[in-house]
Amino acid sequence: MDEYQDMERFSMDNDYEGGRWEGDEFVYQKRKEKRKQTKNDATYGIFAESDSDSDDSGGGGSRRKRRKDRDSGRKADLTKPVNFVSTGTVMPNQEIDKDSREHNDEKDRDKIEDNDMIDEDVEVRGGLGIGSSGLGLGFNANGFDDEDNLLPGALGKKIADRAKMRGKAKVEKRGQEGGGAKGGKKNTLGSDIGQFEKSTKGIGMKLLEKMGYKGGGLGKNQQGIVAPIEAQLRPKNMGMGYNDFKEAKLPDLKKVEEKKIIGVSVSENEQSHGDRGGKNLWKKKKVRKAVYVTAEELLEKKQEAGFGGGQTIIDMRGPQVRVVTNLENLDAEEKAKEADVPMPELQHNLRLIVDLVEHEIQKIDRDLRNERESALSLQQEKEMLINEEEKQKRHLENMEYIADEISRIELENTSGNLTLDSLAIRFEDLQTSYPDDYKLCSLSTIACSLALPLFIRMFQGWDPLSDAVHGLKAISSWRKLLEVEEDHNIWVVSTPYSQLVSEVVLPAVRIAGINTWEPRDPEPMLRFLETWETLLPSSVLQTILDTVVLPKLSTAVEYWDPRRELVAIHVWVHPWLPILGQKLEFLYQIIQMKLSNVLDAWHPSDSSAYTILSPWKTVFDTTSWEQLMRRYIVPKLQLALQEFQVNPANQNLERFDWVMKWASAVPIHLMADMMERFFFPKWLDVLYHWLRAKPRFEEIQGWYYGWKELFPQELTANERIRIQLKRGLDMLMEAVEGVEVSQPRAKANERTQSVPAQAQAQAKAQMDSTEVLSLKEVLEVFAQEQELLFKPKPNRMHNGLQIYGFGNVSVIIDSVNQKLLAQKDGGWFLVTPDDLLRMHNNTTVSAKR
């Protein structure tokens, strides 16, 4: 029965306090007079504050007053909900909520205190006739009325006996726990309540395991719950259906097991420290020590994590838009709601304050670093300005010295004592001592202005064609003083050196080139240009070539006559090819026209034509050279081969040598075609008849190899020539073997039949091209016959067609439509070659008038 000793029994033991029985009626000893109803009672009803406790008298009133005083002195726990006193006996096997258990414990302690106060009150009051016990009439030692006389019958006696037994048990218990009724401290409940369950719980599981239970829910399909339903504390003043409150749900089995393990460890810890914990329950709980983070630690932590990129983040997930400065606590509110953290609004506000403080610390640190960087940059700028100031001071001192030196040079120039050597030495000293100031102040221009009169005096009357080295050393020494080193191209006209050469050297070269230089003798001018190659600026060199050399060459070519000239034209034109290059292309048309006029009357026996034409093979373009050979040289060589006779007995090789001399000049395909058509048929026919006459093979073999050596290397390397020579060798081998020698014409016909159709078409097209002339070629031939100049006009086009000059008339050749157009009165009209000749003659007569 010890387990029910702290619980209140539901009985009638305390129903007859404060009165007595008289007969069959219960009479109160101190009956209060009924209090009159006041205005507040009428207004507030049961909600009015009552002062009936102050009006109570007697033992009951004094007990309620003392109880009220004690209750007023005890601080109420406002965080706990309203609890109701149970009217029945609570069985120990029922689960008791933590808050209700604490409330019942407090109630039991209050009852014990009330009984103590009653005993103390009884002992203090003095009565009559009992002495030191202080008991009055009608009261026993326990402060109650004499219930033996008041309670009637067996029922009353039984109730009184039970009350005495309970009172006696309470007194004994207080004596054991507190050491007496007076001055003893009330003991708290033991900390080992429920420890016995450790040895009793789990027996059911053991029995089930012995019967084959392996865990899981009960039932056929294991649909039963495994973990017990946990009771959840409903918030204070919350009704049953308020705000969709969620009732208890099945907890996770893993969490339940973890919770059981934690509960056992805690209970064991409490048991091991039971004595010390029981004594220290009255002490204040230990407060968690606050951890402070300094600004340096915060900045160091942020620096390790990395500061944000300065991006503004706007959170629009909730009902209100907010700006987020820290992503760490972005979901803190949702997590707090899920974890049921108390006072989430307060924690949110504190978190905002902490974030703002962190942001402010970071801003202050950022401003501090910016200020430090600004101070550092200002310090560097200060040092730079100091250095610039010193540099400017030195520059000013240098400028003063340079100005004084220039003044002294001016005085010497005015007095006439200044020479090129002394002037060069002074400016060389200035350039060496003050290189930056020399460039900045453009002292090269001042030096050029002072040296120019002296150079003009030196080169006065100079002939560059006869004395190319005159003044070369002086110009070379002044080039370094006058050129601009910053510019990659130091030979521009704007440099002082280019100006000096243009005003000193160029006039002398122009005068000598125009007046005394003969283009047919290019050596003097070439020698001068080679000597001054490294000293002449590019602008001056181009001026000499364009204004002196090229006009003189053009005039000489126009007046050149191959019939009267003793010196070949390539002798005095080709040396200018590396220097002039493409600028000579317009002269090639004139040279071709003049050569064509001479080649009309040329005979293959005249070797001078080869001497004049062969050097131009690499100069003219391939098409122009082939047309020239096809039109003027190849026909004459074909006639020479037709007249050539192959006679082993008395062979004359004069005409054959005429043809072989042109083997390196005439294109190889034209030469091979000419030999196949006009030489090898005769040669093979003579060999065939000779082999039929049964000659000596040694003579024929010597004759064959003798002819083979007469062919130049250009022909023997050609496949077509080798085939013809092999045919003769095959005929010779047939005769040696005693086989009948086949006729060369039959083999030629057989070879012609074996040639593919495509090759025959190409050969036919080539033969046709040799016979048919284009409209341009016809006009060229007509201009040569009339001794008129026919050449294209550079950079002049009309409707995408090149404009040519036929004498004094502009002509367009439309090769597609085979039309010839001439310009007349601002328009283009169809004309014939005779019309062009008439128009040229008319323009010539008009010009003479």
From Swiss-Prot:
GO MF entry, a single one: U1 snRNP binding
Deletion consequences: Long circadian-period phenotype under free-running conditions.
GO terms for biological process, alphabetical: mRNA splicing, via spliceosome; regulation of circadian rhythm; spliceosomal complex disassembly
Record has DNA-binding as a keyword: yes
InterPro entries cross-referenced by the UniProt entry: G_patch_dom, GCFC_dom, STIP/TFIP11_N, TFP11, TFP11/STIP/Ntr1
PANTHER family xref list: TUFTELIN-INTERACTING PROTEIN 11, TUFTELIN-INTERACTING PROTEIN 11-RELATED
Function: Involved in pre-mRNA splicing, specifically in spliceosome disassembly during late-stage splicing events. Involved in snRNPs recycling. Required for efficient splicing of genes that act within the plant circadian clock. Part of a transcription elongation checkpoint at alternative exons. Required for correct expression and splicing of DOG1, a regulator of seed dormancy. May induce transient transcriptional pausing of polymerase II at slices sites.
The name this protein goes by in its record: Septin and tuftelin-interacting protein 1 homolog 1
Name of the encoding gene: STIPL1
